Amino acid sequence: MATKSSLDLRSDPRAMIGTREFDAPRDLVFAVFTDPKHLAQWWGPNGFTTTTLSFDMRTGGVWRFIMHGPDGRDYQNRITYEEIVPNERIAYRHGGEPDVEPVQMRQTIVFDDLGGRRTRITWRLDFPSAAERERVIKEYGADTGMVQTLTRLADYLAADTMQTERNFASGR
């Protein structure tokens, strides 16, 4: 059974750290971060959908996507991958397109194998300053959004883990 998401805003004033455990093996949890077809099923807060424009998941590669808000507003996003260690870690620089939203934050996701087909992820967002973190929380609801995104990921993995595993095994 997946536990509730936790969010740490206290240990570092420039960081936001989300944690959640999942009833799914580590390789599967990692895999749903590596395919835009699966990312589209869970990425973002409640009510959001995601359209991938380009996806190149390798060190130095870029994922460009649009998050469509429930209010009809579109949010351009750009992720540049800095480090990928399969089944263990993904680190990237995340922000909007430079001419639209210049904020850039470093994000690191660590995948911990808890045994028994359980995985914990720790998702850390490091902002350039405490003021920038507070601005992103105030303007975008990033704190609530992180918790909702982790919950959507848990729901996606729980919906049919065996079907998801079969889809990855067959390349769908």
Stretch-by-stretch model annotation:
Residues 26, 57-58, 82-88, 110-120:
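A short, structured loop/turn motif at beta-sheet edges
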Residues 29, 39, 63-65, 81, ...:
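Hydrophobic pocket/interface hotspot
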Residues 62-96:
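Helix-adjacent hinge/juxtasegments
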Residues 97-147:
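Beta-strand/loop substructures that line and gate deep hydrophobic ligand-binding cavities in soluble
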Residues 1-49, 172:
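Hydrophobic ligand-binding cavity/cleft-lining segments
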Residues 17-18, 37-74, 165-172:
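Short beta-edge strand/loop motif at the mouth of beta-sheet-based domains
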Residues 13-19, 50, 62, 76, ...:
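Intrinsic-disorder/low-complexity, polar/charged segments enriched in Ser/Thr/Lys/Arg/Asp/Glu/Gln
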Residues 20, 52-55, 77-83, 94, ...:
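Hydrophobic/aromatic beta-strand elements that line small-molecule binding cavities or substrate pockets
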